[in-house]
């Protein structure tokens, strides 16, 4: 016999995971001095994920040694945007100008560990296992930031012109090449 008994194994082994997520969005628009509007927008996402697996040392695939595995992942990300806009009508002429700033931030913390050689049967805690077979942990961060402006003009809702400029930076690139400029005219 290979020591397998599915019902008994299912009763003794444990597989567990949990996830928590919190998300939120907020914005406010404030109008002032007749033609100005300031807008503030933001969102946030927080996530935690935990996975655990326990294999008993009495019967089944982990007979004689036992097995435990734990993985923890924590994510945090947010975006913030600030805009200042000015709009004005001069007879048949309409002019709009906007300037803004936006930033994004992402962070991940990841930890994983696997151990074997269970000391006391049925205790599914890392401290109850003596030999680490796998261990990994890392942090990842990614950020972007942008500054931008746009001007629009229209005459009598017939002729239109627009120009925009944007300067964006990303943490994924080397500091010598982190920022880029983008523009359009039409």
Question: Model regions: which residues?
Answer:
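Surface-exposed loop/turn segments flanking beta-strands in extracellular/periplasmic regions
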Residues: 1-8, 53-68, 109-136
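Feature captures outer-membrane beta-barrel proteins of Gram-negative bacteria and organelles
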Residues: 180-186
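Outer-membrane beta-barrel transmembrane strands
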Residues: 7-45, 49-53, 69-89, 96, ...
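N-terminal active-site segment of His-dependent metallophosphoesterases
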Residues: 105
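Extended hydrophobic secondary-structure segments that form protein cores and membrane-embedded regions
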Residues: 96-102
């Amino acid at each position: 016999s290979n020591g397998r008994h599915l019902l008994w194994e299912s009763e003794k082994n444990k597989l567990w995971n949990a996830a928590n997520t919190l998300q939120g969005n907020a914005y406010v628009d404030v109008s002032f001095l007749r033609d100005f509007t300031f807008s503030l927008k933001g969102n946030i996402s927080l996530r935690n994920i935990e996975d655990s697996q326990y294999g008993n040392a009495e019967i089944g695939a982990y007979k004689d040694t036992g097995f435990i595995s734990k993985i923890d992942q924590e994510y945090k990300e947010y975006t913030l945007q600030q805009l200042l806009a000015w709009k004005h009508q001069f007879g048949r002429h309409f002019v709009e100008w906007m300037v803004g700033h936006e930033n994004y931030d992402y962070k991940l913390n990841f930890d994983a560990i696997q151990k074997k050689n269970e000391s006391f049967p049925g205790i599914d805690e890392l401290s109850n296992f003596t030999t680490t077979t796998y261990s990994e942990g890392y942090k990842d961060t990614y950020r972007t930031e942008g500054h931008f402006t746009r001007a629009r003009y229209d005459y009598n809702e017939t002729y239109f012109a627009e120009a925009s400029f944007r300067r964006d930076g990303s943490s994924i690139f080397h500091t010598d090449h982190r920022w880029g400029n983008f523009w359009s005219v039409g």
